[in-house]
């Protein structure tokens, strides 16, 4: 990658102090890069990913027609995973870890994570519940209420952060199902890296795609992990997209452009 391109992918100095502050209170850091669609095929080949070994998933989001939850930094998502498993997630992004209740921090279902992308980062709080793939499908198809897919803790977290007009069970159950989006998730363990790689290919109904490569690490390993990932990708000529955005942001941009 040319030096000028590297400059665009560095986190601005003004944000470094904030990042260091957030890292101290985070549970984990996920270093990510998004690859432009024109380079997907070459990237998958160069990093050694076998598409046949990828795990298929279906991802659903739940929001209002105007995406009011997303605009308030709140996301409700459910996933169906190959083999009959699934999960539901209520995520707040961005979040200041210092403002999170200690009771919530002690829950093994709640995590503070930093997504670090070229040029920036975002800190999020995620409340997760495991469920079956059928439970996800039933809620997505309206056979069961969305609230039945969430735990009491998730419902409380939702109510605390949703807009007042939405933050109760009645309005929660009236949210639209957005999706599904089809996802292929692959895991790699290159010999050149101390940590494994996760590769996710998100396929949108209009034919567009989002390819993200990431590695997860402990907060005190973040800068080392980022440098190692960039070195690994540079050595293989992987092109980094000029506009970096999270998978959720890409999905919501799609849904905003294709409102019912």
Model-derived features: positions:
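Phosphate-end processing signature that detects enzymes handling 5′-triphosphorylated RNA
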Residues: 2-260
């Amino acid at each position: 990658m040319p030096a000028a391109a590297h400059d665009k992918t560095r986190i601005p100095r003004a944000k470094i102090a904030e990042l260091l502050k957030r890292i101290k209170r985070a549970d984990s850091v996920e270093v990510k890069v998004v690859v432009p669609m024109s380079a997907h095929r070459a990237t998958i080949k160069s990093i050694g990913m076998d598409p046949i070994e990828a795990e298929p998933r279906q991802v659903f989001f739940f929001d209002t027609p105007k995406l009011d939850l997303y605009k308030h930094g709140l996301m409700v998502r459910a996933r169906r995973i190959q083999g009959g498993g699934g999960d539901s997630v209520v995520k707040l992004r961005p979040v200041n870890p210092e403002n999170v209740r200690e009771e919530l921090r002690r829950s093994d279902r709640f995590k503070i994570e930093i997504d670090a992308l070229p040029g920036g980062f975002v800190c999020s709080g995620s409340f997760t519940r495991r469920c079956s793939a059928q439970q996800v499908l039933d809620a997505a198809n309206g056979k069961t209420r969305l609230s039945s897919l969430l735990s009491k803790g998730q419902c409380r977290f939702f109510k605390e952060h949703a807009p007042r007009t939405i933050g109760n069970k009645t309005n929660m159950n009236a949210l639209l199902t957005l999706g599904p989006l089809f996802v292929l998730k692959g895991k790699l363990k290159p010999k050149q890296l101390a940590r494994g790689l996760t590769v996710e290919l998100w396929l949108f109904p209009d034919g567009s795609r989002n390819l993200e490569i990431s590695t997860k690490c402990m907060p005190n390993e973040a800068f080392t992990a980022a440098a190692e990932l960039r070195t690994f990708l540079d050595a293989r000529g992987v092109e980094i997209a000029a506009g970096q955005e999270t998978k959720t942001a890409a999905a919501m941009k799609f849904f905003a452009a294709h409102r019912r």
